[in-house]
Amino acid sequence: MELKGSRTEQNLLNAFSGESMARNKYLFFAEKAKQENHPEVAELFEKMAQNEGMHGKLLYHYLKGVGGTAENLREAVDGEYGEWSRMYPEFARIAREEGFEAIGKLFDEITKIER
């Protein structure tokens, strides 16, 4: 059976996205806990982030897997180019169109950083 185009592939993508977002969120929470002098809570969030990262790695294996360094560099360059040349400028335009000027500016700033 072919994974490409299957509901299972979509579930893998959704799960990978969720695990990736949770990992970042927990790292943000850990940083805040450190700022508020709660090292034990920060450590807990960091462990949770590590676990989410491992879940993401397992899921990614089925989606694409990690290639060789040259292939990984090409994929990274292509992804970053797409973000700053198309995705973020379009997001900025839409944000402004909908009246979210501050978010439009955020997308513009991210565009500059991504370049």
Spans of features found by a protein language model:
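Non-heme di-metal
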Residues: 1-115
